[in-house]
Amino acid sequence: MSKRAYNFCAGPAALPEAVLLRAQSELLDWHGKGLSVMEMSHRSDEFVSIATKAEQDLRDLLNIPSNYKVLFLQGGASQQFAQIPLNLLPENGSADYIDTGIWSQKAIEEASRFGRVNVAATAKPYDYFAIPGQNEWKLSQDAAYVHYAPNETIGGLEFQWVPETGDVPLVADMSSDILSRPIDVSRFGMIYAGAQKNIGPSGIVVNIVREDLLGHARSLCPTMLDYKVAADNGSMYNTPPTLAWYLSGLVFEWLKEQGGVEAIGKLNDVKQRTLYDFIDASGLYSNPINKADRSWMNVPFRLADDRLDKPFLVGAEARGLLNLKGHRSVGGMRASIYNAVDINAVNALVSYMAEFEKEHG
């Protein structure tokens, strides 16, 4: 096998090489059963054992309390933008949303189709370069829930704190930062995460839902989108995305082997500091985000001259540094350094950036 590239893609993102090799070894013959996971009945003892272990490993990693259900559902976070209000927002109720970037805005736009949405805070006055402090928020006393995105992958903002919402359930889109450092699940009513950044391949979404929030779906909510139906059926009301579920389980196993979320969080801290410290000391590269709000997972940066963007990307690809082009809506560069992107990848990127600056700075 030729040397694997360093993949800085925002999603679908890098997967641990050990997970890929394990999946490769089991692809044609899972545990001597003579068939692939892709060919198994989702109701077979074999796949049920895979699903059960994946859930337990995730519970162990995040210390999920027993009064929370863990769901493995089809689709991604964008589907949750509709599924959440269909399950949690009463017909005549309202929900509070926090706007810190493009993904927050997509959630707001979709929820507005199903009821009243109060944008309780927005980063717009800060040009989305900083997160408004909670003293600036205007939360509703009667909100059904408060929704926010702890990490905005495109803008590169990340909450370094958990909002206080009292008795109002806090709903978090953790698609891009789940499992990147320890969290207290009990502070949330619901956590959801599309898999293709820090969990596994695309096509599956993980929902961690407090039990008292189940059973309140609207009458018009499709059966397939009802969280209680999913919970009552072990996430198997219909045939689930079995391969993605299995691969996610392998990632959970790998994370436990690395020492769990606390250990991976320390590694992620080293990675993000290595990259930001280099950018801040550079004369060619810059990051516009307020330092207290910088994302650990998604690091956007610009070159002083946009005309250097193309040669920078060409040189990066020649060195096996892939998918560094920034999102089309903001331009520049973006390095996504999720759990599976190790410090060697970050060091290789910094080394190339220094070399490029020496030639073009």
Show which residues each predicted segment covers.
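PLP-dependent enzyme catalytic core of the Aspartate aminotransferase-like
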Residues: M1-A5, A318, G331-G361
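Active-site phosphate-binding strand-loop segment of PLP-dependent enzymes
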Residues: G11, A111, T122-I178
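Active-site C-terminal subdomain of aminotransferase-like
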Residues: P16, A195-Y276, E359-G361
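Conserved N-terminal alpha-helix of the aminotransferase class I/II PLP-enzyme fold
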Residues: G34-Q80, N87, I102, E110
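PLP-dependent aminotransferase-like
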Residues: S78-V146
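Conserved active-site segment immediately N-terminal to the catalytic lysine
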Residues: V171, V185-Q196, V205
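Conserved PLP-binding catalytic core of the aspartate aminotransferase-like
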Residues: Y285-A316
